[in-house]
Amino acid sequence: MGATGLRSYALKSYGVKMSPEEARLYRRRFFKTYPGLKSWHDNERRTWQRGGTETRTVTGRRRMDIQKLTDRLNAPVQGTAADGLKLARALLWERRGECPGAVPVLVCHDEVVVECSAEQAADAKARLEKAMIEGIDTVLNGADEGHVPVEVEARVAISWGEGG
């Protein structure tokens, strides 16, 4: 995201107004703090400028016919997160006997909804968190746990529509 996009995103999402120079400054500071990300962005930009139209997730899943730079930058990140979520869902299914009344009923973007009785809620929440962490950790770190820390948030609610 360039400085113009950052300004627009900050205003629309958070009501934060910033000048073009402030947006450029925040962007420079961000990349100075995360030089590896800056290097990756620069490399992806060069590849895109040379006509590179394919990206891959950490697991190797391909996205073809990339036309826009933002898609080239977003696809590997979002796709890798999706790969981790898919593995987490598989782990939930494999372990369904551990909490038989807890049933995954919905996946939307990065959210998983599990239905269960009130008595099982704490156990179902813990099992969901464990599966999510293990799935994403396996995708990001493989057999070597601990390189990229993984955190997830889960909550117990009466309905998915509850704020939180």
Where are these regions (language model features)?
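Conserved catalytic core of nucleotide polymerization and phosphodiester-bond processing enzymes
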Residues: 1-164
